[in-house]
Amino acid sequence: MSRADGTAATKHTSIGHGAACGCGASRRHFLAGAAAFGASAALPAMQASAQPAPAKLIDTHHHFYPPQYQKAWGESEDKRKIPHLGVQLAWTREHAFEAMDKAGITTGVLSLPSTPGVWFDAGAEAAHDMARLCCEFGAEMVRDRPGRYGLFAPLSMLDVDATLKEIEYAFDTLKADGINLQSNYGDKWLGHAFYKPILEELNRRKAVIFVHPLVASCCDAHLSVGAFPAIIEVPHDTTRTIVSLLLSGTLTRLRDIKWLFSHGGGTIPFLAGRIEGFYDPKAFSGAKGRGPNGFAPDGIAAEFRRLHYDTANATHPAAMAALQKLVPMSQVTYGTDYPYFAFDQFRELRQLGLAAADLAGIESGNAERLLPRLKT
């Protein structure tokens, strides 16, 4: 194949990925009980806020479901005997747009939720086809509602050459705003060497990468606590993939990628000190973090500060307090996790006593700086 810059691309082989967990494929499962009791009729995410929305509000964590994707998801859940979640089944582009208007969302940046059953069950070729289909559906939504949507294009990631072609198509043909990755693909987090050619191409393009977590195949219902593994495991998997990117040197080596992580960075704000303590060579003789050849030449805290984080399900005062200690608020964007959670989480942000400039940045300014097309 030929790369987008005209240079010959090295032929890469696909690699087997571990089977997806059959019990806790994503954050959706912690709501599955509500769906089983008929909560789908309520669709709480579609309720308008009683408090007026900001003049401009950009949601960088906004899910969408092409019909073929919904069908494949339903089949994967049937295979695993997982109850269907009503808000996902009820989603249509018309309902989603109506909900945005009611809640005062100016722009929603589209991304897929993490659904390993859809990705892995039929193999790399089917995953490639699904990624293409979803990209095209999302791009159509962007074209149909100018200024109201952006697109983080999903990549299949199971075959390197196919994924490089997907990147070229997403940016050069569909004009995607950025890329949508899962935190892991089977048994590999994003710092794994298998993904090196993919991330190098995204670095060359100075891409924004939005990372959405899922329950890892290692940590299904048999190893997690509680009825819904996603409640605990989803934020932990964000931490796993950030640490894999850190320790592999990817964050340092590929400086032109702009990373955006979900849910306030998972548990990174709470574990940052522990991570730094263990991998700082002053505390741990096996670490090689500092120095010109280290994975964190400016220190681990500096690497975490360079990343971007959204506020989806992270507006609790304790969570936001930790995030504020970790990064400047210029690195934080507004996210909702629609349709699983309400659009109006800005009300909780307004109760945190943030400076007016910081609040305005979270609501829209930081996203506009990260994704300049959204300024129009």
Pin down the residues of each PLM region.
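A short acidic, glycine-rich active-site loop
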Residues: 81-90, 128, 231-238, 290-291
